[in-house]
């Protein structure tokens, strides 16, 4: 199995020379053994006794072990296959009392492009297939994104985070920051959780309390454009408030597309009253995204800042390419606020170097590990050639013109009810980051 089979972000695969090595080959994680006071005598034998392989217990390194280890930037593909795969998905779906699937709009867009259908048709297809398989709800991850955007702006205005503030929604960037530039980058990373994590909290806490179901009896799967989201779901903070993960299984767009190819469904589900966040996708409604295909975080921050400003401000855009854009709120010739969209490892490295020299002068940076952002995630459906892939990126679009006011009103009602069900609900919406201390072995390999 080679790297091309699993599309981790480039920032994860090339940031460390010891990266992307299967644990069975060269894992530096020390194996635990009990200490003993028994003295051992060593003597030379002419012939070694044959070891009984059947009596030796197999050593297993879990995904969580890899994330806690300083030897690699990320875990091995074999571990991800074992813990985040179709068999794991089917197993969890079969055992659950309540099952929910969260689907990203980028995944819907990729599937729609491949099948030559409208986004709403693709949304209905995905919902029908998985509801036929046993899913109770198939929901749009953008409902969680609305919460992430709102809290990100509150944090931007009120927090004491060092400027610039970097978004913390890309697990590839977060993993890179913690393991290579922890002291430098962590004080700048937003503590607001990603849309996938927000949906995890909604499902495992809000819905669990609302429907009187224990969190461990709920199976929550997600469909994401990025394999790095499998890493995010395995992070230990997703289990801090529960006895189980908030997201039990993450499937890539390509993995879900393969499932769709194996299934067929002509059954339609009738609309039960008003379309809401729990049944929007099955009715072909996708929450729109203004400001690009990666969540629109920079756009949201600067536009809301302008709306709330007591002084009339204008927006000035500088677009260098698809991976680098600067948006400034200006009052005449004065720059009042400066935000940026930064995609791809090369641009991230440039910002790290500027930060080291205290020359990163932006207030807020929407930062993603993948070139072209989330729409180009490694888990998306791949084209046969580079030319087709470029055409795909130019063609795939997310809904951006529809009014989200109805969904935003629903979110406010959910927040109000959630606060009654769990007075500490806000604690579930933020996270913390930890710099991983490198071992001596890793320092040697890094400086090799």
Curated annotation (Swiss-Prot):
InterPro entries: Cytosolic_Fe-S_CAF, Fe_hydrogenase, Fe_hydrogenase_lsu_C
Protein residues bound to [4Fe-4S] cluster 2: 170, 226, 370, 374
Binding site for [4Fe-4S] cluster 1: 27, 66, 69, 72
Pfam families found in the cross-reference section: Fe_hyd_lg_C
SUPFAM superfamilies: Fe-only hydrogenase
GO MF: 4 iron, 4 sulfur cluster binding; metal ion binding
GO biological process: iron-sulfur cluster assembly
Coiled-coil region list: none
Top-rank taxon: Eukaryota
Keywords: 4Fe-4S, Iron, Iron-sulfur, Metal-binding
UniProt xrefs under PANTHER family: NITRATE, FORMATE, IRON DEHYDROGENASE (PTHR11615)
Entry similarity comment: Belongs to the NARF family.
Role: Component of the cytosolic iron-sulfur (Fe/S) protein assembly machinery. Required for maturation of extramitochondrial Fe/S proteins.
Protein name: Probable cytosolic Fe-S cluster assembly factor Bm6838
């Amino acid at each position: 199995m080679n790297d091309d089979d699993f599309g981790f972000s480039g920032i994860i695969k090339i940031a460390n020379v010891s990266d992307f090595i299967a644990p069975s080959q060269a894992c530096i994680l020390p194996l635990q053994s009990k200490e003993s006071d028994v003295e051992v005598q060593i003597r030379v034998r002419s012939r070694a006794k044959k070891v009984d392989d059947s009596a030796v217990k197999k050593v297993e390194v879990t995904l969580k072990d890899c994330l806690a280890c300083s030897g690699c930037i990320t875990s091995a593909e074999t571990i991800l296959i074992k813990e985040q795969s179709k068999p794991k998905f089917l197993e969890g779906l079969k055992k659950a009392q309540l099952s929910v699937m969260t689907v990203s709009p980028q995944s819907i867009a990729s599937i729609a492009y491949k099948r030559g259908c409208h986004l709403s048709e693709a949304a209905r297809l995905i919902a029908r297939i998985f509801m036929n398989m046993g899913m109770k709800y198939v929901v749009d991850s953008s409902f969680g994104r609305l919460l992430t955007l709102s809290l990100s702006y509150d944090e931007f205005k009120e927090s004491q985070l060092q400027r610039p503030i970097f978004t913390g929604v890309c697990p590839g960037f977060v993993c890179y920051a913690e393991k290579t530039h922890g002291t430098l980058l962590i004080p700048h990373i937003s503590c607001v959780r990603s849309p996938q994590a927000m949906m995890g909290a909604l499902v495992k806490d809000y819905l669990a309390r609302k429907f009187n179901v224990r969190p461990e009896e709920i199976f929550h799967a997600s469909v994401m454009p990025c394999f790095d989201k499998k890493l995010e779901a395995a992070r230990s903070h997703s289990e801090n408030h529960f006895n189980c993960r908030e997201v039990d299984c993450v499937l890539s767009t390509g993995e879900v597309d393969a499932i769709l190819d194996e299934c067929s469904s002509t059954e339609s589900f009738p609309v039960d009253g008003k379309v809401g966040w729990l049944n929007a996708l099955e009715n072909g409604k996708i929450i729109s995204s203004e400001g690009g295909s990666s969540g629109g975080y920079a756009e949201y921050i600067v536009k809301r800042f302008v709306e709330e400003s007591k002084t009339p401000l204008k927006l000035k855009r500088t677009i260098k390419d698809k991976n680098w854009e600067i948006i400034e709120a200006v009052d005449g010739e004065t720059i009042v606020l400066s935000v940026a969209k930064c995609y791809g490892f090369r641009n991230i490295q440039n910002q790290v170097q500027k930060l080291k020299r205290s020359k990163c002068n932006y207030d807020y940076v929407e930062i993603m590990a993948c070139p072209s952002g989330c729409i180009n995630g490694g888990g998306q459906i791949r084209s046969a050639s580079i030319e087709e892939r470029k055409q795909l990126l130019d063609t795939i679009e997310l809904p951006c013109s529809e009014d989200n006011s109805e969904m935003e009103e629903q979110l406010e009602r959910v927040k109000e009810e959630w606060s009654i069900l769990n007075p500490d609900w806000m604690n579930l919406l933020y996270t913390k980051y930890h710099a991983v201390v490198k071992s001596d072995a890793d320092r040697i390999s890094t400086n090799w």
